[in-house]
Amino acid sequence: MASMVAFRPEAFLCFSPPKTTRSTRSPRISMASTVGPSTKVEIPKKPFMPPREVHVQVTHSMPPQKIEIFKSLEDWAENNILVHLKPVEKCWQPQDFLPDPSSEGFHEEVKELRERSKEIPDGYYVCLVGDMITEEALPTYQTMLNTLDGVRDETGASLTSWAVWTRAWTAEENRHGDLLNKYLYLSGRVDMKQIEKTIQYLIGSGMDPRTENSPYLGFIYTSFQERATFISHGNTARHAKEHGDVKLAQICGTIASDEKRHETAYTKIVEKLFEIDPDGTVLSFADMMKKKISMPAHLMYDGQDDNLFEHFSAVAQRLGVDTAKDYADILEFLINRWKVGELTGFSGEGKRAQDFVCTLAPRIRRIEERAQERAKQAPRIPCSWIYGREVQL
């Protein structure tokens, strides 16, 4: 774990200012960190991925004896986590929200969809595309979950509760990207080829969440991320309704509902870990917050913009879709959900970790106020997802 250094306000921003010169892409994002820069390794440009940096990888940091904790929780997971999955036959499918291609009225429905889409500004589409691309990188997220010691799917069809959850969660999430992708395609408002290239680059690049094969770190990360996607899709639903597209609002709201259900499952796992191993869990929580929670799509690239994720994040921050305030809200939500501030009996190191996470959100909120002021002077830049039209950061 990197040592703590002085609190750096700029580390809490949801984006970085656009750079005037070409830079090696970095997964550095902006949300919450009070640690200094860790050692990174530059990855040279290859035909299937952009030049970038990743942190020096730490693997299998969880003590082997703690694997037994997760094996002992098999029955608990079956009774308490798998219940948050829905039977396939009761799940919505993308086609439930899209024009029926076998219908006589298909072309008229598509025409109506395209007319509604004309009322929505470009900035909103940048946010919606970014959300869709994030959802479409699902192979990476399943891969990440299967790096976690003690809970991975060892065979590809394992019947352990952890493996069943990972596969079924992936299957439920798969509908999100499918639905948004088809909707955006039919809208005619976005450059699908550039979006498809971005998805391919992103899946090829992977992600660098720094979870060290530890399910403690991994499930804290997924708890945070499911809450974040619930908020983001909820915000795009609200914006769509404000712009008069009730159907798109329904789509985004339905996806948000799924994310909320998944958040419930992941936060329940961490709650159980706090019950069994409070010291180890609070240390893991502080560790993830010191590293900062990198967004799943932080390595996105479209073949043109070396700072694409930072620019997407800036637009999302300005429009209120995904903000530093949300980050602070999520942190406070998790602290309250897991009753971190009320727990006692920690070691000295555990108590310091508890104090760190419980005092972090107010600092983030102070930085959010400064970020909002800076955003008012942000420039406009072209975005390949909307045919090179300019959007304000």
Curated annotation (Swiss-Prot):
Single Gene Ontology BP term? fatty acid biosynthetic process
Class in the EC hierarchy, top level = oxidoreductase
The text of the family note is: Belongs to the fatty acid desaturase type 2 family.
Keyword set includes Plastid: yes
Superkingdom field: Eukaryota
Identify the GO cellular component terms for this protein: chloroplast stroma
Keywords from the named record: Chloroplast, Fatty acid biosynthesis, Fatty acid metabolism, Iron, Lipid biosynthesis, Lipid metabolism, Metal-binding, Oxidoreductase, Plastid, Transit peptide
Record function comment = Converts stearoyl-ACP to oleoyl-ACP by introduction of a cis double bond between carbons 9 and 10 of the acyl chain.
Task: Give GO MF terms, alphabetically.
Answer: metal ion binding; stearoyl-[ACP] desaturase activity
Query: Which pathway does it operate in?
Result: Lipid metabolism; fatty acid metabolism
Q: Where is the transit peptide?
A: 1-31
Provide the E.C. number(s) assigned to this enzyme.
1.14.19.2
List required co-factors.
Fe(2+)
Q: Where in the cell is it found?
A: Plastid, Chloroplast; Plastid
What is its quaternary makeup?
Homodimer.
What is the reaction catalyzed?
Answer: octadecanoyl-[ACP] + 2 reduced [2Fe-2S]-[ferredoxin] + O2 + 2 H(+) = (9Z)-octadecenoyl-[ACP] + 2 oxidized [2Fe-2S]-[ferredoxin] + 2 H2O
**Would you tell me the protein name for this molecule?**
Stearoyl-[acyl-carrier-protein] 9-desaturase, chloroplastic
Q: What is the lineage of its organism?
A: Eukaryota, Viridiplantae, Streptophyta, Embryophyta, Tracheophyta
Q: Which residues form a coiled coil?
A: none
- The residues that the entry says bind Fe cation 1 are 135, 173, 176, 259
Pfam families, per database record? FA_desaturase_2 (PF03405)
- Residues that, per the record, bind Fe cation 2: 173, 226, 259, 262
Instruction: Describe cofactor binding as the record notes it.
Output: Binds 2 Fe(2+) ions per subunit.
| Primary localization | plastid
